[in-house]
Amino acid sequence: MQTLNRRDFPGRSHPDKIIQFGEGNFLRAFVDWQIDLLNEHTDLNAGIVVIRPIDTDFPPSLSTQDGLYTAVIRGLNEQGEAVRESRLIRSVNREINIYRQFDDYLALARDANIRFMFSNTTEAGIAWNEADQFSDAPPSSFPAKLTRLLFERFEHFDGAADKGWVLLPCELIDYNGEALRELVLRYASHWQLPAAFTHWLTENNTFCSTLVDRIVTGYPRDEVAALQTELGYQDSFLDTAEYFYLFVIQGPQGLAQELRLDQLDLNVRIVDDIKPYKERKVAILNGAHTALVPVAYLSGLDTVGQTMDDAQISRFVEKTITEEIVPVLDLPEDELLSFSQAVLSRFRNPFIQHQLLSIALNGMTKFRTRILPQLLTYQQQKGQLPPRLTFALAALIAFYRGEREGQTYPLQDDAHWLERYSTLWNGVKHGDIALAELVNRVLSDANHWGQDLTAVPQLANQVTEQLQTILSRGMRAAVAAYS
């Protein structure tokens, strides 16, 4: 069976226009996949040069396959039908190992055609390293590497205003574009680079903050043989992802024309502020995940897919989203409901097996960041507590007993919470404290919640009553009132 290469698998090729820091699965099934679609259906005509930002030879270079690889997209489409699409991605031209090919890396700065930069160097990638020097070949941090490249471009083109870049970091941190911009400017100052360079950076380069959303499941180890037989070639860089994707870019509206988004209807939004979209994702997608985990797991289910196949629990999830989360979010209702339906479809994806216990990791912090804001806003706006969100909190407290149908299961959270719950539940078990006292001690932890939640009218009472019902009647009977 042949291995992918451009000689044996000829097709479209495109001039270098994009630099991409990061060779991992996510960008290849997200950015590179979208650029490939734009190359096919518009006149974008943009090739990608991938920069490996860390000093490692594993995995092998994409250049061993001339940049070619297959993206397998699978999930439920807008009609709820299971679909699978295999696409040979031709948008990547080659990969450069910056630690072995530093001169080739700097040469990219001197290419007048380069216009865009994408990156995903993980959440830890956009960071400062005091030890990085301009003379390092290369510096260690990603922002320092980028600063060095930008200065090379500034010098080569004598600070030409039309040679700046559009920079679109995809790292999962808030306002990633602003964070990257600040660090690049900090390196420019730290290295005492000319003031004219700083002016060129701020006036002629556009740092865009982004929000990225797609579950990328990566290399399908257990299915590789079958997939390669079906495709008819060997592909060491096979990449799999869900059907849904969303790319929100905080940037100038002209970017839509530059990326040819006006010629192809991709799920990309150019907006003035990504904050509402971040809040929507955290509240609906992540919030629903966090709300369903303890309810579903204590109902005897083990995966998100099983949860959505269970009529009772799936109704609880849907009503939680549409009746208690969506009404308090600050975006048009039709957009929120459309996103909610997409989330529910993603939860039903038969190609992804999300274990509830893995999602349960750090559940206390997740509840605080993903659900509590909506719970409190609902109470303030409507003068009453959202019953399903408080039930999710009661279920979470019950979950930290660590017991389902007489069997224990592993709990993964901050040691402080694991120790506290162990002590509290033992106290209830031996009759040393009442259930209401357990709830009060959990809710009154202002260091965790940011406030004493026992001060929220009726919250402690409602959670205690719901928790008592869960313990006395079982989760199935308790959740029936909210399904």
UniProtKB/Swiss-Prot annotation:
Domain of life of the organism encoding this protein: Bacteria
A GO molecular-function descriptor: tagaturonate reductase activity
Pathway info: Carbohydrate metabolism; pentose and glucuronate interconversion
InterPro entries in the record: 6-PGluconate_DH-like_C_sf, 6PGD_dom2, Altronate_OxRdtase, Mannitol_DH_C, Mannitol_DH_N, NAD(P)-bd_dom_sf
Keyword Transport among UniProt keywords: no
GO BP: D-galacturonate catabolic process; mannitol catabolic process
GO terms under cellular component: cytosol
Record's catalysed reaction(s): D-altronate + NAD(+) = keto-D-tagaturonate + NADH + H(+)
Binding site for NAD(+): I18, I19, Q20, F21, G22, E23, G24, N25, F26, L27, R28, A29
Keywords for the protein's UniProt record, in alphabetical order: NAD, Oxidoreductase
Primary enzyme class: oxidoreductase
EC number: 1.1.1.58
Family: Belongs to the mannitol dehydrogenase family. UxaB subfamily.
The protein, known as: Altronate oxidoreductase
